[in-house]
Each structure stands twice: as C-alpha cells, then as structure tokens.
Design a protein with these regions (language model features):
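Canonical tetratricopeptide repeat
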Residues: 23, 57, 91-95
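Terminal, low-structured helical/coil segments at or just beyond the last alpha-helical repeat
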Residues: 72-106
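Canonical positions in the second alpha-helix
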Residues: 10, 43-44, 77-78
Length: 106
C-alpha cells in the first residue's frame, strides 16, 4: 500500500514519469486488478512507446483474454523495439500457438 501511494503521489507531481505508471501496473497485477493494470500499462506506453516491459505485460493480458489478433499486432511492435526482452518473443509466440490450438479444439 505504501509503495502504491508513493507512485501515485509521484504521478501527481510528475505526470510524465512512465516508470511510476509501470510500477503501478505491476502493483495492480499483484492485486489482480486488471482494469487498473491495463490503464497504467497503456499510459506507460503512451509516454514511453519503446518500453519493452510494459509491452510484454500488455501482451500477457491480451493472451489471457484470447485476443489473438491484438497479440499478433503487439508482438510485431514488440519485435521492433526489443533490446532486453527479445528472448521473450519465442515464449509469446509459443503461448499464442498453444492458445489458438486450444481454442480451435473447443
């Protein structure tokens, strides 16, 4: 709770701090508050379009929702910006294949 408050306060004083939005998204992820997590990830990417971690987290949310077309689009964007998280692309692609196969068999 203290961390969340500090990041929220930082946003009040520095509304363009993408890292605060990212860390809030992580906190909301732990709290399983997907709506707030998504909102903060989108703000992070608005302020810092090349933020790999936010993009990866957003892809995970869309995979969970079975929003495969969005996952494909986000993965293309992720491919173009990745530096540190490039190894995660194969993981995303495998999860997408598995989810699509599972949905097709239902």
């Amino acid at each position: 709770e203290v961390s969340k408050f500090l990041f929220q306060r930082n946003i009040v004083f520095n509304p363009k701090d993408a890292k605060s939005y990212l860390y809030l998204a992580k906190i909301y992820n732990l709290e399983e508050n997907e709506k707030e997590e998504l909102k903060n990830l989108e703000t992070t990417l608005l302020l810092d379009p090349k933020n790999e971690e936010a993009m990866y987290m957003l892809i995970q949310i869309e995979l969970k929702k079975s929003n495969f077309s969005e996952v494909k689009d986000l993965t293309k964007r992720f491919n173009s910006i990745c530096l540190k998280f490039c190894k995660k692309i194969k993981d995303i692609e495998q999860k997408l294949k598995d989810a699509q196969a599972k949905e097709a068999s239902n």
